[in-house]
């Protein structure tokens, strides 16, 4: 299951991703797609599993704590309440990026801690929900999404064009973005 490919803006990172990106781009040729900005922060997931709310970093299920940045974002965005309201009696994960002061050198350049979603995952069926389902959930529940670069009906970009897009993309703070993520529209 291909989930997305990052095109890094630095040349060394791009070379490391080249083979993976090329294969993924070939699979996506002619298919509907979405391109978003890669936020430079830390992976953060809010989830409901069997009625219990939890917060994870990329590799750890975190204990609830007001001192933990991940949990502070969950509280600030009322993630538990919003997920349970929108997906009653379902096991769902909202995957996103935590960024801001104290996170990965704050390369985005914001003044406060922030979260933006990039995936919805149905835990029971083990499948990612569509871009439109993510968009509707985030709109209805006022949860920020990763910045959208482009949505299209037929992916036909060359690797060089994708690199150009990634190299010139900026965050709203005018800092150069970490890169782009390309996904099937589903």
Regions found by a protein language model. Give the residues of each.
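Core nucleotide-handling region used for phosphoryl-transfer chemistry
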Residues: 1-186
């Amino acid at each position: 299951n291909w989930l997305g490919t990052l095109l890094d803006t630095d040349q060394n990172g791009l070379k490391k991703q080249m083979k993976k990106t090329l294969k993924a781009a070939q699979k996506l040729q002619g298919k509907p797609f979405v391109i978003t900005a890669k936020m430079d922060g830390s992976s953060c997931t809010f989830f409901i599993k069997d009625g219990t709310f939890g917060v994870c970093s990329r590799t750890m299920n975190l204990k609830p704590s007001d001192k933990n940045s991940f949990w502070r974002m969950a509280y600030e965005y009322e993630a538990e309440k919003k997920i349970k309201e929108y997906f009653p009696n379902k096991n769902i994960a909202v995957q996103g990026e935590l960024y801001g002061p104290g996170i990965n050198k704050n390369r985005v350049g914001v003044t406060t801690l922030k979260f933006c979603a990039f995936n919805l995952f149905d835990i029971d069926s083990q499948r990612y929900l569509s871009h439109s389902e993510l968009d509707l959930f985030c709109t209805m529940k006022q949860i920020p999404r990763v910045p959208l670069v482009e949505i299209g009906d037929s992916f036909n970009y060359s690797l060089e064009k994708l690199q150009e897009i990634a190299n010139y993309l900026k965050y709203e703070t005018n800092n150069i973005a970490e890169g782009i993520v390309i996904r099937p529209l589903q």
